[in-house]
Amino acid sequence: MTKFVFVTGGVVSSLGKGIAAASLAAILESRGLKVTLLKLDPYINVDPGTMSPFQHGEVFVTEDGAETDLDLGHYERFVSAKMRKSNNFTTGQIYESVIRKERRGEYLGKTVQVIPHITNEIQAFIERGAAASHDGKADVALVEIGGTVGDIESLPFLEAARQMSLRMGRNRCAFVHLTLVPFIASAGELKTKPTQHSVQKLREIGISPTALLCRADRPIPDDERAKISLFANIPQDAVISVWDADSIYKIPQMLNEQGLDRLICEELRLDPKPADLSMWQKLVNAQENPEHEITIGMVGKYVDLTESYKSLIEALRHAGMHTATRVNIEYIDSEELESGHLEVLAPLDAILVPGGFGKRGTEGKIRAIQYARENKVPYLGICLGMQLAVIEFARHVAGMTDANSTEFNLETEHPVVALITEWVDREGKVEQRSAESDLGGTMRLGAQRVPVKEGTKAASIYGAEVNERHRHRYEVNNHYVPTLENAGMVISARTPTENLPEMMELPGSMHPWFVGVQFHPEFTSTPRDGHPLFKAYVEAALAGQQRKGA
């Protein structure tokens, strides 16, 4: 029988509810429990797929092809369970489902209201999401409720959580509330009043937290914890101090040392084995004691908001942990490269162009790719980064000076990258799209197995097959592949059904390490295992650094 831990937030957003939930889940998993996580987003969008990265950050793609909140990426990095579409849902999905039921007459003529119809639907989604993991036998499901207590958008979700707790009875539900304890420099002290008011607001809804996670820029002294305990009406040992850490992988140990997992297990009447966090300690030690150091230039248009590349940044850090390397990331605005300024690329040990959409900044990215190719700097292109590498090669090596993508120029003489109009999805179903199709939910999404060409860099990295996740509408145009191959490019992986290029590379005679992938490998990297492609990329950067030194 699955038990539930609801994780809520107060005072301000962006306190790290996702990291807190994932860290607690990691501790519970280390105690031998089967754990899953869900994220409830209060916005009315059906999913974040069409939301601006500047507003929402990264869109994380699950194995089954769902476009979800970036917190699901944290969940997969901290626990062994794979997230699915059912692990993330929004107000938009809830209302869409209820309205469909009303149109079908399932409510038998009743007036459809927020309570009970919307809140019942939320509960059904939560229980269905929890049942989708571990063959329906998860011991604990942690449910992160997006937004901040007091926001009107979050109220139906909080009410649904309260109703679930009442319906399931004691010891089936626990509540963890994350709040802010700011340090006021002019007063020289931490202020607990925002936390007091946040808990008061939560209790007005009918929810009393089992534990409080108090975020601050420093450890919270015992006297302040005692004060919070008094006003929040919870024991002092349930007031957990969560201070700023230089690595998110230190958080599980921080929470465990203060007994959060013990409190939750006692509340839920669970008696698992003691926590074993030795793996997390080993990862932190590897991160803090590197033997090498490199700098990678990430060339993109969302570089002012690194949340847009959250999984990619973490994947590079994981590769650093597994190669004893400190990976520094230099964020380079691609638009600045369009007018020159290529000198910023000279100190870099490697260059990376991540995924993205739209024409803005693409010519700057192409200039960075040309620099990497001509100066033998290790290069990794992901999704759009592979497409632009093909365009750059077509223009400057294969003689197609007008080469472009139809995403950026419909009139290009050489559309070496074009819209996918038909492909077979991971379940064998034929999908068809056109330029007039809706933007939402119409991309090639999810994991797909693809054979790899023998004797290539791709084969040395992945072996005979690659299984990675996709999120894109455009593909390398097969019509131009023979011309590109005649000029020296190697297409090292193709989809088995449509023969679409999945990986490209340059041979060793042209470049020491130049690889492009149409998929998103960052979505499957974990701190436990790293990722073979990113490890190979970091090793190539180290080799290039040695060549420069020599």
Curated annotation (Swiss-Prot):
Residues 295-547 form the Glutamine amidotransferase type-1 domain. Residues 1-270 are annotated as: Amidoligase domain. Its EC number is 6.3.4.2. The keyword Nuclease does not apply. UTP binds at S13, K191, T192, K193, P194, T195, Q196, K227. Signal peptide: none annotated. L-glutamine binds at G356, L384, G385, M386, Q387, E407, R473. It is an enzyme of class 6 (ligase). It catalyses: UTP + L-glutamine + ATP + H2O = CTP + L-glutamate + ADP + phosphate + 2 H(+); L-glutamine + H2O = L-glutamate + NH4(+); UTP + NH4(+) + ATP = CTP + ADP + phosphate + 2 H(+). Pathway: Pyrimidine metabolism; CTP biosynthesis via de novo pathway; CTP from UDP: step 2/2. CTP binds at S13, D151, I152, E153, K191, T192, K193, P194, T195, Q196, K227. GO terms for biological process: 'de novo' CTP biosynthetic process; pyrimidine nucleobase biosynthetic process. Keywords: ATP-binding, Glutamine amidotransferase, Ligase, Magnesium, Metal-binding, Nucleotide-binding, Pyrimidine biosynthesis. The keyword Magnesium applies. Belongs to the CTP synthase family. Catalyzes the ATP-dependent amination of UTP to CTP with either L-glutamine or ammonia as the source of nitrogen. Regulates intracellular CTP levels through interactions with the four ribonucleotide triphosphates. Homotetramer. This is CTP synthase. It comes from Cupriavidus pinatubonensis (strain JMP 134 / LMG 1197) (Cupriavidus necator (strain JMP 134)).
